[in-house]
């Protein structure tokens, strides 16, 4: 199977039952995304497929042949951080760091969702364009769990990147 992950082409011969997360971690040595619960409940495995965030532990790799997949490794480098990565550092949006790759991938995708006008559950009027408010961003990030409780710092990092007030 052919995959494009973080702008790089990969060929992989994996069992059709292999999750996208296991493809990345076990076969391609892209270990940034974490396996927290392996049930889609924690968000530690969040990656983006064609710009849409997914729980990579719940998605079979074979479903994404030919898709453009982005993991935390594809967002920035230690020398040139993605703006969201830099904001997480600035605002201490991490503590133990286990959930951080998934949080950052989700945060990047959340801001893109808002920019594209994708509605959410907290909007009073689904015909209005969503705004990057604290409530809006927190609702959209609710699928990403941080056991250390860095939620306020994560919200501050997202607000900085969005140009909004946390």
Task: Identify the residue ranges that each predicted region occupies.
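Signature of N-terminal electron-transfer/Fe-S-associated modules in redox systems
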Residues: 1-166
């Amino acid at each position: 199977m052919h995959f494009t992950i973080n702008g790089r082409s990969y060929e992989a011969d994996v069992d059709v039952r292999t999750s996208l997360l296991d493809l990345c971690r076990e076969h391609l040595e892209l270990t940034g995304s974490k396996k927290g619960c392996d049930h889609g409940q924690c968000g530690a495995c969040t990656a983006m497929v064609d710009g849409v965030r997914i729980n990579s532990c719940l998605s079979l790799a074979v479903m994404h042949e030919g898709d453009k997949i982005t993991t935390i490794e594809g967002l920035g480098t230690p020398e040139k951080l993605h703006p969201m990565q830099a904001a997480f550092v600035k605002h201490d949006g991490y503590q133990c760091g286990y959930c951080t790759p998934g949080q950052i991938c989700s945060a990047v995708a959340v801001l893109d969702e808002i920019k594209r006008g994708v509605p959410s559950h907290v909007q009073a009027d689904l015909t209005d364009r969503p705004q990057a408010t604290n409530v809006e961003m927190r609702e959209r990030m609710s699928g990403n769990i941080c056991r250390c409780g860095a939620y306020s710092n994560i919200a501050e990092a997202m607000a900085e990147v969005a140009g909004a007030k946390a």
